[in-house]
């Protein structure tokens, strides 16, 4: 990135420590809701806020101008062992209103993806499965994993009588405990 490199006295290849410290000073700052106005002022690109898992935060994201919300626990890196993100999705979608909600966290199969779409997610991210495929089989392995996830989603929809994603979304999810 030429803009980032212009902040450095030496190229990162020559002084990696300085590059790391500059990166941390530039991008490692704590962000607050008040920063959204600045973000909106410096770009015409859509702003998607990731890590929104509470309906109050979803409403605040919409109020501050987020173009989309990414309901995610960041792959469990930030805090592991909390409430499953899928259990939070419906409330986030409801609070977001017409603002699109994307989802990831624990998506390991086509079934997981279809459930998230039925709960209102507009799109579903898949993290670990394709990286496992990549590690084991390179690009072909990653492609195989993604094809398998899509095939499972298609099969689940077909056997349950939903020919399209619109049908899945219209049906929603009913959860029974007990």
Locations of regions flagged by a protein language model:
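C-terminal helical cap(s) of enzyme catalytic domains, especially alpha/beta-barrels
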Residues: 81, 85-95, 134-155
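Alpha/beta enzyme core
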Residues: 1-103, 110-132, 168
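Charged C-terminal helix
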Residues: 151-178
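Short coil/turn linker and secondary-structure boundary residues
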Residues: 31, 137, 160-163
